[in-house]
Amino acid sequence: MTDAIRTDAFLPHPPEKVWRALTEPELLASWLMPNDFEPIVGHRFTFRTDPVPAHGFDGIVRCQVLELEPPSRLRISWAGGGIDTTVTWDLAAEGHGTRLLLSHEGFDGDDPAQQATMRILGGGWSGHLARRLERTLAES
């Protein structure tokens, strides 16, 4: 069983612009979730969304900035709804844009509940990167 979500997207924007969408709280909220993010290693913050009681999710994702290498890498912890994982965004200039790789790792491949959560989040990450992030970048 797999224990990670991996997505890959090409965005027709420079890495610095994509980086801002990942690290400026207002831009991050516009494509992901409301948050109190600060781009400081060690900073603890939350993302907030609608609770999903059936999955034991209170609507709060508790995070901490683990690694910050502007404008090429952001890694955070991601805990909520019974999972304790990490999310890493890697950015690389490519042609007239940016290649954005997302890795959401640390799921228990043997736990059916975590596998279900991983499937839900996998679809969400794909949709957010493909549509919502691109819309935020186009509008900012």
Language model region names:
Residues 6-7, 17, 25-60, 73:
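Short beta-edge strand/loop motif at the mouth of beta-sheet-based domains
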Residues 1-15:
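Terminal, regulation- and interaction-focused segments at domain boundaries
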Residues 21-22, 68:
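Conserved catalytic core of Hanks-type protein kinase domains
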Residues 18, 28, 45-47, 65, ...:
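Hydrophobic pocket/interface hotspot
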Residues 36, 52-101, 105-108:
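Hydrophobic-ligand binding "helix-grip"
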